[in-house]
């Protein structure tokens, strides 16, 4: 995966002691965005040492390595309430769009590196939350990801 916006890799966020010395008011932020800027494969926020939670949404919107959008703020709230020390956000479709209709109109809404990002995150954390909602059925993508990642928790 090509990381356009930060030098921290998802691998180091999920599997290292990188955050052992963080102060309470410090949040590590990062994102893996394609060189063309059309796809966001992962986004992470880490506020303390300890386990992270992975969320899989429908598609990325405006959030990036430095900017949070409403979905990211909501997921940070869930992760903190559940006792996690950080989160990684991935999506069924990596195409960046503020409206699902725009994502659905894209030639390749999934993105060439998205399945690799999903598999990596799933294999490197214990809690993966399916949070894609009813529109995840587009192109049968919800079923594809459920088959690829058997250990999912669901938000209802």
Q: Which residues fall in each region the model found?
A:
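Active-site and ligand/interface coordination hotspots across diverse enzymes
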Residues: 1-69
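Short acidic (Asp/Glu) patches
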Residues: 37, 69-76, 107-116
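Residues at alpha-helix caps and immediate loop-helix transition turns in enzyme cores, especially N-
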Residues: 67-71, 140-142
């Amino acid at each position: 995966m090509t990381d356009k916006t930060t030098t921290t890799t998802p691998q180091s966020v999920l599997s290292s002691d990188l955050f052992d010395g963080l102060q309470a008011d410090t949040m590590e932020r990062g994102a893996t965005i394609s060189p063309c800027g059309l796809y966001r494969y992962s986004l992470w926020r880490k506020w303390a040492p300890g386990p992270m939670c992975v969320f899989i949404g429908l598609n990325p919107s405006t959030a990036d390595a430095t900017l949070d959008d409403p979905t990211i703020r909501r997921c940070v709230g869930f992760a903190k309430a559940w006792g996690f020390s950080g989160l990684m956000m991935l999506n069924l479709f990596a195409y960046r769009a503020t409206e699902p209709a725009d994502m659905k109109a894209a030639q390749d809404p999934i993105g060439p590196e998205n399945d690799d990002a999903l598999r990596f995150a799933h294999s490197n954390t214990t809690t993966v939350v399916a949070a894609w909602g009813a529109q995840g059925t587009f192109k049968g993508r919800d079923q594809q990801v459920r088959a690829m990642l058997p250990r999912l928790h669901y938000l209802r």
